[in-house]
């Protein structure tokens, strides 16, 4: 495998949230999550993976399975070990740009995500994904 480069850039969206994969190796994936203010995801964990998130813009509040908050502002991050249940919300007054690093332990796990109700996801987000919104043509968030 060769070295590769990437840019922290993602389209603006009209609502909801998006995820754009930036690069990957056999044991690591990196991506950029983009959430409009107020948007959150569901309580979940990642078997076989540790995750790191760094706030590039906006504000994120991460919650553990007991719903205890940890507020992160621009330039702050959190590391989440395998089997740690969490969810997060864009809690600032501007969209949240969140750099994500996923490190796999050993070979690729068969189950990539499990929510609090036991629902499992086995497919990896390898394409640009927008949930509950549309991209805004010609408008982008990027690290400057």
Question: Which ranges hold each PLM region?
Answer:
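Short strand-connecting beta-turns/loops that link adjacent beta-strands
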Residues: 26-27, 48, 67, 93-94
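A short, N-terminal "cap"/entry segment at the start of jelly-roll beta-barrel domains
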Residues: 1-32, 42-43, 113-144
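Short, conserved beta-strand element in jelly-roll/cupin
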Residues: 34-36, 45-62, 101-104
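A short hydrophobic beta-strand segment most commonly corresponding to one strand
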Residues: 52, 79, 93-110
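Short acidic-glycine-tyrosine-enriched beta hairpin
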Residues: 66-82
